[in-house]
Amino acid sequence: MRFRWSALMAALTLILMPRVGSAQAAATTTQKSPVAKLEQNYPNPFNPETRIPFSIGGYPTCTDQSHQYKVTLRIYNVLMQLVAVPVIQGGAGNVAGGQPLQNVLVPCGQYVAYWNGNYGNTRKEAASGVYVYALEVDGQKLVNKMIVMK
C-alpha cells in the first residue's frame, strides 16, 4: 500500500511539474529567476488547519515594485479534484486578509495562505490523506504536497 501511494505521488509530481525545454536548459547564463517560491506548509502533517508560505516577484530583492502578479492557490486531493481555495492570512498591499487566492493581483512580497482543512466553503472536514497544493503565478505553476492526519 505504501508503494502505491509513493508511486501515485511521484506520478502526480511529474505531471504537474513545469517542463523545461532543451533550448531553455542550454541557455543557463541568461535564465531568469523564478517568479515565485512555494514553501512547505506548516505544520505538516496537520489537523485541522495549516498555513502555506510563498513569495512573489523574487522577494526580498524585488526589482519592480509596481508590477502586479496574478496569483491562484488551489488544494487538490490525490485524484486531482479541487478540494479548496485557501485564503490570504493577514493582509498585504492591496490584498485584504481572508480573501480567497483565486486570480488575485498582488505586488512583490512574502505571503501566507491559510486553509481551515474543510472542503470548499463547507464545514465538512477533509479526510486524512495526502493533498497537493498548486500555486500559479503569471502562468508559472509550483506544486507541493501535504498530509492531513486525523
Residues covered by each model-derived region:
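Sec/Tat signal peptide C-region and signal peptidase I cleavage site
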Residues: R19-A23
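Bacterial N-terminal signal peptides
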Residues: M9-M17
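Short loop/turn motifs at secondary-structure boundaries
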Residues: A25-K150
